[in-house]
Amino acid sequence: MANVVGTNTCVAVQDTNLVGTNTYVAVQETNIVGQDPITNEELYILKRDGSKEILSFDKILKRVKALGTETKPHLNVNYSQLVMKVVDQLYNTMPTYVIDELTAEQCASLITKHLDYGTLASRIIVSNNHKNTLASFAVTMDKLYHFKDIHGLHSPLIHKDVWELSQKNAAFFQSIIDYSRDYLLDYFGFKTLERAYLMKIGKKVVERPQHMWLRVALGIHGADLERVSETYELISQKYFTHATPTLFNAGTNHPQLSSCYLIAMEEDSVDGIYNTLKDCAKISKWAGGIGLHVHNVRAAGTHINGTNGVSNGLSPMLRVFNTTARYIDQGGGRRAGSFAIYLEPWHADIEAFLDMKKNHGDEEMRARDLFYSLWIPDLFMEKVKKDEDWCLFCPHKCPGLADCYGAAFNALYEKYRLEGKANKTVKARTLWFKILDSQMETGTPYLLYKDQANKKSNQQNLGVIKSSNLCVAPETQILTDQGYFEIK
């Protein structure tokens, strides 16, 4: 806690520590300093150059006012009240960059009073970033390239080619970079970049948002400076942005820029399951999202010839994938891993699958950090519409159902049904309502339609499509020679 005291001329400032909205106290307008309320000793702040200075209410107020009024539009906020809230939370030798962060947080908390507080929060936090980082793109890239780890070994954070281009074309890059565009970001957008996207040395952020945009453009286009400039101009003015893996990894020694990977379960065996798990872990390490289909994994209770035992089914296996998604997060702690698991509704473990994300039930049968999706054949929806029976099969006893679609799937399904190979028979509509119940409670499973996806595929010669990726959106568009069209 800081007490605001001083000498010279008094002005009325609202007392934010008192109950009510119209109570005012007299404080000094100039040379206002902080005192420790217990020892009555003067409070100091720690400047960015390492020196100490007596805490001054006026200097904080002047800085905040300048950010609110020197750039248009001028902001409609109560600067004195804001700074009083901040000063009330200061402690001795608090660094100035922490004061900026605290002030921005206070502004963000007042957005519901006036939107201008959000704008001021953005200006403060971006200004703070500029004061803490270098204004030279080339020098920043040089620091990242010459980084040494805790053992003193050279451990470059960017690729050598990117570093060489940044040094060779330093004047060009400095001429196109526009740091004022950092102020186009709102407070929460900047904090997201600061937390996970801007490159750090240790725990210290060394990039500005503009450095990141230019690094991404350089990582994509390399020595093609015209394309680098064009891409930077568009990204920095918010015409578009690249996906997270590109922002994380462009220009680095591991330029993995793809967002989504579609993976098949290698085979229904210990080796196949854990080889697939290893692939998922490696992809997640470099920020890739994963769509994995598990149609070929045998259902619970199915006999295992090698051990003369029975399978535990999908649920325990998916808990292992869930734990991997949590442990092997994206970019080393920057973002949680994301796996979407696809299953066809004829699989005998479908009912347990629908419960995996629910908030109640047996914890040993839950894997709530995964996303779930159904790869639905038209035959199932026809059975739902007619309120007919639906057979559930084990892929080990009834192979091939995931490898065909349309009429071929219908024929194989009917063959297995007539042979009495179903593990269980349920009402299709009852299963459908269980699907809807899970959606209402958890938001999943996503519903995609197997026959339609395969009928519309331009790569039917390559085989049957068995899943989609992590992200499913109905408004997805495809590019044709006549422009973009929504998938229908």
PLM region spans:
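Extended catalytic cores of very large enzyme megasubunits
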Residues: 2-15, 20-475, 488
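Short, structured beta-strand/loop micro-motifs enriched in basic residues and often containing a Trp
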Residues: 473-483
